[in-house]
């Protein structure tokens, strides 16, 4: 939700160029990694619910400070603070609390549900950020964002988590931060959110994102009907084929039926592609590495979105290429990398679990 708001605000209030505004917005993705080395210490030394709720509260408080800053540098600082806090929230929710409250035989499903919910939430936020700016002031939308954070705090507070005695852990480690075993599939996965991030910059039509959401729901319905696991190569082929088809439509025209048809195709493609990439990211971790593996996925997903935002704006400003064509190229690279190397990597390392 904050991306379209802050991007537009940077241009209108601070007279930033499109590329500068994209850079200020995308620094959020780098900041996600700042607290990572302390993640395991935080959630195994302090109450996990408290770590989560207090991080969300600080995230909300930082968010309402934007109207009071006096320089672009202070805006960058707020983006860094929000990125770091959001990184802690991601770790405390998706890779910690969601697993803690789920029986071991249902944890794969819990990871999937959390992922699907986060994608729907991201698309909903983009729509609110685009449409809300037409009816409400910047300050009002920031307070609405803080209100949503308050709702999240209430919901997390209602979760019952078993008591865990504090552990004597080192201050810094890679636990609950980055799992190198899943890093290569994760880098391959980043091509999917990078394409989405590029579209976030290029298209400000809320109905387009509703079409993406509809396509994603179509994938979920297909997945419920055909419950048997699909071959990974075939699933990635289908996903990237739909995404590529949507991008080709946008290369021809990004208005009217072309735009909405492309959104539907991209939504279906994202669903199929992420379905397989997520499967790898939750099956490759060894015993007691699930939280770290899933957090690696979360970090790389968010980083991919922010990287796509910056790449799209850079390509637009350079003026040498059509950003949709660049996005199509990224889609093809992701497909080829999976088919040539990552599928064999997954098969080999999964069999050695």
Regions found by a protein language model. Give the residues of each.
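A late C-terminal transmembrane helix in Major Facilitator Superfamily
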Residues: 280, 284-321, 327
